C-alpha cells in the first residue's frame, strides 16, 4: 500500500488559455476523460471553477467522490485534492500549463495512496487513471492538430 505517482505530459497546438479553459472547467474536463463530472460548489472568485470550487466525479455506478480546487492560477496552474469519498487518500492533482509560442505543454501529476490494504489496488487505480486521462488528453490534442 504505497504512494502512487502519475505523470502525464501532453502537448497541444493551441494556446495555454484555450487548453486551460477546457481542462479546468469541471464539466468539460469530464467530457475529455469520459467521466461524469459535475460542479457542486462554485468558487467565490471570478471563475466558477476556480479556487474553492468542488466537483463530484461519478467514476463507476455507486462510486462517487468530490475534489476541491486548492490552487487556481489562470492559464498556468490548477491543483486539487479529494475532499470527500473515494477509495484513495492523500490525493493531490496538479495541472501545469506552459505556453510556448502559441502552443501548450501540459504536465499533469497525480499522487495518491489507496485506502484499502488490498494487494495491487494502488497499481490498478494508477493504470486506470493513466489510461482514462492519457487517452482523453491525446484525443483533445488531436482536435488541434494542423
Short names for language-model regions:
Residues 1-44:
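Hydrophobic ligand-binding cavity/cleft-lining segments
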Residues 8-10, 66-71, 91-99:
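Hydrophobic/aromatic beta-strand elements that line small-molecule binding cavities or substrate pockets
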Residues 11, 15, 61, 83-85, ...:
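Structured loop/turn residues at secondary-structure junctions
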Residues 15, 62, 74-75, 100-103:
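Short strand-connecting beta-turns/loops that link adjacent beta-strands
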Residues 31, 40-86, 135-146:
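Glycine-rich portal/gate segments that line the openings of hydrophobic small-molecule binding cavities
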Residues 83-134, 146:
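Beta-strand/loop substructures that line and gate deep hydrophobic ligand-binding cavities in soluble
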Amino acid at each position: 500500500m504505497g504512494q502512487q505517482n502519475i505523470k502525464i505530459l501532453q502537448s497541444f497546438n493551441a494556446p495555454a488559455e484555450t487548453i486551460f479553459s477546457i481542462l479546468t472547467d469541471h464539466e468539460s474536463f469530464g467530457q475529455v476523460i469520459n467521466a461524469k463530472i459535475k460542479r457542486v460548489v462554485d468558487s467565490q472568485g471570478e471563475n466558477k471553477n476556480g479556487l474553492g470550487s468542488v466537483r463530484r466525479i461519478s467514476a463507476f455506478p455507486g462510486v462517487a467522490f468530490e475534489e476541491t480546487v486548492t490552487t487556481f492560477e489562470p492559464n498556468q496552474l490548477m491543483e486539487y485534492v479529494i475532499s470527500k469519498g473515494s477509495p484513495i487518500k492523500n490525493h493531490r492533482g496538479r495541472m501545469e500549463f506552459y505556453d510556448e509560442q502559441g502552443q501548450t505543454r501540459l504536465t499533469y501529476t497525480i499522487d495518491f495512496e489507496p485506502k484499502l490494504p488490498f494487494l495491487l489496488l494502488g497499481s490498478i487505480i494508477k493504470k486506470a487513471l493513466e489510461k482514462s486521462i492519457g487517452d482523453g488528453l491525446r484525443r483533445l490534442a488531436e482536435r488541434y492538430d494542423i
